[in-house]
């Protein structure tokens, strides 16, 4: 509470400043009104020129906002209110603008997006789902295109070429997951041409609380298949029903964890025929057991997932939508598949990962909008250094929030809900009902059918018509049953949403705001005017009936989600009403103090169908929600603390990759690598005693696997001068450097000038990627078991940092060692490549061999133990270029390796948060957009489609 007050200390001054900015913009309105369309459009070029000449965006703000407001008025027929000007200015200043539902956040976003696009560095507008990204890019994009800016949208099914084009636009709309995955894919790319993003300048996050708070518990992960037997999942799915809750294992529903008791462990050990489940060799079995029990107790069919066509399909617990192609992580999905007896699909290995917190902290400037941010102001400030500015409403709030009604049973609660809906419908008042699952929404729908109440159901099974249903949810007599967050981002306007109804009418006529822009814009005003008259007449009737009635059938674990549901009513000063119906069987009530309330109701002999309203119940609910919010915040803080370790390492690797991709000359870096590796070899061999104690044969055997050694150890020992460690190192280093100079002359002579520099680039990139993937796997494994350190009175986070640091440096040493070995030993030749019409040409190809050569095996062993030199006997020839790992490209005539084949594309999976914090995993087929490549034919088709689209514009 104290922190919240401190954070709001300067709020009044900032609001005064924002009001002054809005007043200044209003003073410019008459001048802007007098401009023709062409003159208004020319203002954009003028602003760009002035900014290039040194004028700051802050100085341009009043004029740019005035121009953008007029652009919106001419294209959309909507003029920004003063509070929207204030909200836009707050966003430009890098703040979170808290604007209530219906205050026009989407329109507000146009102002700072337009202003910051003038800098020419790209503005990213982040939304919660693909539908909203496309809608806003089409809808608000009309304003930007009218003013001469380009607008792009990132969709999940786009090719890399389409993504690159969208990012090249002045303003790009997309979801947080797509922006984050593109960043990760860019850092897996093999050439700059494969990268799609162009930096991180300014991001405006719509529904910022949802994206930066709720979804921040789940990191973004790109993974590929890992070898894993499905036998153990089936085995533990067989064993789980044998164990009884509270006897063999305990379940903590609040933390969503399970713990096996001694009796449970004994049963498992007997069934598996093992002596100790917790000994090191059996550690993986504990994970299978925990997942099997979680699948049994915490993941319910038709609530958390459904089984369709032999597949387990996740249902988003917050929106009720089916999440096709998405999978739970860490073996959880496989455990559920085993439980349901369907095909068990392979687990994955992490290839790249980042948390949303660290992704959004890449931006030079970050801002956000939401209707409910004040409760999380401290976290926004602590994690993102973002202040929260409550923007006043355009008109006073007139919604009546009724007290909660608590029933003893769920059946009685839903009967009361159905009766309330029937009563409101009979008088014509529109009703929006919020449920927590598909199952409950369908149960309520059946009750309404029995009562003869016509209604629309908005859940996972019917989400295709989501926008249309929500747009009409404010019409007279409308009854809409929706899962909690469905339709977020679409205003429920009394009488109907004019813009959506007009857009639907024009689309019925075959017109699209992008493909048929001119015809669409020409017909828009007349259609809007016609629909506006009809809507306004109906809206007046609805206002007299009391406005939109929002009815919640259960409290959410977060107060913000409850407030978001309530916020659908009472927009722009309209009347409205809200009420929550609860039962003692609700999940939140069960998790906290429901037994106490039930005891009171039983003592008072309260019938099942009679609700209670009491301060004690209200306090219990508020206390429960506060506890869950605190738990979730701790989880997010913990995720961030652990990812900070990875973030430092990721920055080093990604910066190095970028330098390699941008063509930095690696000659000096490679020379340092040679010196470091040779020095490590010599130091390891000469650590003890004097020259007569050193194992020269072992050292020379190792050095020969690294490079062609020309100096003899016998000659050094037999020389007149005493052989010291320093002299030995000096001689070997001189020999290695001479060998590398000879190697460079050989490669350049065989292929052409500069070939060695290109070989260095490809080898370093290849080894870097493979070592980073291996390191991610090791770090995942470390994190899984690090919690056990607490039992030894050690801080798991401190241990994770320390061991992660050691592992990272070991990985860098192994990277140097393998890179040097490849550069000396890889076979190259000059030859014309075979025609490859489906593959782009790039300077060098590097691909993974099916079986590692002895040299490669020895390199891997040496990397595993830094203190010892363990090298295999050298072969007569080094590995072919085709044996370098990680290639994704075809070699040109300049430089090729023997036996080079085009590598197969890897099937990737993308794991990230759902709209409200659940976990989703999307699978892609090999060769689809996610791997960052496309065939030449696909690129040509995409280019033709883009050219046609541009021509129509």
From Swiss-Prot:
Residues 908-934 have a biased composition (Polar residues). Pfam families: P-loop_SecA, SecA_DEAD, SecA_PP_bind, SecA_SW. It catalyses: ATP + H2O + cellular proteinSide 1 = ADP + phosphate + cellular proteinSide 2. The keyword Ribosomal protein does not apply. One of its GO terms (biological process) is protein transport by the Sec complex. Keywords: ATP-binding, Cell membrane, Cytoplasm, Membrane, Nucleotide-binding, Protein transport, Translocase, Translocation, Transport. It is a peripheral membrane protein. Residues 898-907, 940-953 have a biased composition (Basic and acidic residues). This is Protein translocase subunit SecA. It comes from Saccharopolyspora erythraea (strain ATCC 11635 / DSM 40517 / JCM 4748 / NBRC 13426 / NCIMB 8594 / NRRL 2338). The gene is secA.
């Amino acid at each position: 509470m104290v922190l919240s007050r401190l954070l709001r200390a300067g709020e009044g001054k900032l609001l005064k400043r924002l009001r002054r900015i809005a007043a200044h913009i209003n003073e410019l309105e008459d001048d802007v009104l007098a401009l023709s369309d062409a003159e208004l459009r020319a203002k954009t070029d003028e602003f760009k020129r002035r900014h290039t000449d040194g004028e700051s965006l802050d100085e341009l703000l009043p004029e740019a906002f005035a121009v953008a407001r007029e652009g919106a008025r001419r294209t959309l027929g909507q003029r920004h209110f003063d509070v929207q000007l204030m909200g836009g200015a707050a966003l430009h200043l890098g703040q979170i603008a808290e604007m209530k539902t219906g205050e026009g956040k989407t329109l507000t976003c146009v102002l700072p997006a337009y202003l910051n696009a003038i800098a020419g560095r790209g503005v990213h507008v982040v939304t919660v789902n693909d539908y909203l990204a496309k809608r806003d890019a089409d809808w608000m994009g009309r304003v930007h295109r009218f003013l001469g800016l380009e607008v792009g949208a990132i969709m999940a099914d786009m090719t890399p070429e389409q993504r690159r084009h969208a990012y090249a636009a002045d303003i790009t709309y997309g979801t947080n997951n797509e922006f984050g995955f593109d960043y990760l894919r860019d850092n897996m790319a093999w050439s700059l041409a494969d990268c799609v993003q162009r930096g991180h300048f300014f991001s405006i996050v719509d529904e910022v609380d949802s994206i930066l708070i709720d979804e921040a518990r789940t990191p973004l992960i790109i993974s590929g298949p890992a070898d894993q037997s499905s036998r153990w999942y089936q085995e533990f799915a067989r064993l789980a029903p044998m164990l009884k809750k509270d006897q063999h294992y305990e379940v903590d529903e609040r933390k969503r964890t399970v713990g096996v008791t001694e009796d449970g462990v004994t049963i498992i050990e007997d069934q598996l025929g093992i002596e100790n489940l917790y000994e090191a060799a059996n550690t993986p079995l504990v994970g299978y057991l925990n997942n099997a029990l979680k699948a049994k107790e915490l993941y319910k069919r038709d609530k958390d997932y459904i089984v369709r066509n032999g597949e387990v399909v996740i249902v988003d617990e917050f929106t009720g939508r089916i999440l096709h192609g998405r999978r739970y992580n860490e073996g959880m999905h496989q455990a559920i598949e085993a439980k349901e007896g369907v095909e068990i699909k392979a687990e994955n290995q992490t290839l790249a990962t980042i948390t949303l917190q660290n992704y959004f902290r890449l931006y030079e400037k970050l801002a956000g909008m939401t209707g409910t941010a004040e409760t999380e102001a401290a976290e926004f400030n602590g994690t993102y250094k973002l202040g929260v500015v409550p923007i006043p409403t355009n008109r006073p709030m007139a919604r009546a929030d009724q007290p909660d009604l608590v029933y003893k049973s769920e059946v009685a609660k839903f009967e009361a809900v159905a009766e309330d809906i029937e009563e409101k419908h009979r008088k014509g008042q529109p009703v929006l009902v919020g449920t927590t699952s598909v199952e409950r929404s369908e149960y309520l729908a059946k009750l309404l059918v029995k009562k003869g109440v016509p209604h629309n159901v908005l859940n996972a099974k019917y989400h295709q018509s989501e926008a249309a249903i929500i747009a009409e949810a404010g019409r007279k007599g409308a009854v809409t049953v929706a899962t909690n967050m469905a339709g977020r981002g679409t205003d429920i306007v009394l009488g109907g949403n004019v813009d959506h109804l007009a857009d639907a009418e024009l689309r019925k006529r075959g017109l699209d705001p992008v493909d048929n822009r001119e015809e669409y814009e020409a017909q828009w005003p007349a259609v809007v005017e016609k629909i506006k008259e009809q809507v306004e007449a109906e809206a007046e009737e609805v206002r007299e009936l009391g406005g939109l009635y929002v009815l919640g059938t259960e409290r959410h674990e977060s107060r913000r989600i409850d407030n978001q549901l309530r916020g659908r009513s009472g927009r722009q000063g309209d009347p409205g009403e809200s009420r929550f119906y609860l039962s003692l069987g609700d999940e939140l009530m069960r998790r906290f103090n429901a037994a106490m309330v039930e005891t009171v109701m039983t003592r008072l002999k309260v019938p099942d169908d009679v609700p209670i309203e009491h301060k004690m119940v209200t306090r219990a609910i508020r206390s429960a929600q506060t506890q869950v919010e605190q738990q979730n915040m701790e989880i997010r803080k913990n995720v961030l603390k652990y990812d900070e370790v990875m973030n430092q390492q990721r920055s080093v690797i990604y910066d190095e990759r970028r330098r390699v991709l941008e063509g930095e000359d690696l000659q000096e870096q490679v020379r340092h690598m040679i010196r470091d590796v040779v020095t490590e070899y010599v130091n390891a061999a000469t650590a003890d005693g004097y020259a007569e104690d050193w194992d020269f044969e072992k050292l020379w055997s190792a050095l020969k696997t690294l490079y062609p050694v020309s100096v003899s150890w016998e000659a050094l020992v037999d020389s007149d001068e005493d052989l010291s460690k320093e002299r030995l190192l000096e001689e070997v280093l001189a020999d290695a450097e001479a060998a590398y100079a000879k190697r460079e002359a050989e490669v350049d002579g065989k292929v052409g000038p500069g070939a060695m520099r290109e070989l260095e680039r490809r080898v370093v990139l290849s080894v870097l990627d493979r070592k980073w993937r291996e390191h991610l796997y090791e770090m995942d494994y470390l994190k899984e078991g690090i919690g056990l350190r607490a039992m030894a009175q050690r801080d798991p986070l401190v241990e994770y940092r320390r061991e992660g640091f050691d592992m990272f440096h070991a990985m860098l040493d192994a990277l140097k060692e393998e890179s040097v070995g490849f550069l000396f030993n890889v076979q190259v030749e000059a030859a014309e490549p075979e025609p490859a019409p489906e593959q782009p040409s790039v300077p060098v190809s590097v691909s993974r061999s099916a079986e590692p050569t002895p040299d490669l095996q020895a390199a891997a062993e040496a990397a595993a133990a830094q203190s010892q030199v363990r090298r295999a006997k050298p072969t007569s020839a080094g590995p072919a270029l085709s044996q370098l790992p990680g290639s994704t490209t075809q070699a040109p005539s300049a430089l090729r390796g023997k036996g080079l084949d085009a590598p197969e594309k890897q099937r990737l999976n993308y794991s990230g948060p759902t709209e409200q914090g659940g976990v989703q995993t999307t699978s892609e087929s090999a060769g689809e957009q996610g791997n960052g490549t496309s065939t030449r034919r696909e690129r040509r088709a995409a280019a033709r489609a883009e050219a046609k689209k541009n021509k129509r514009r």
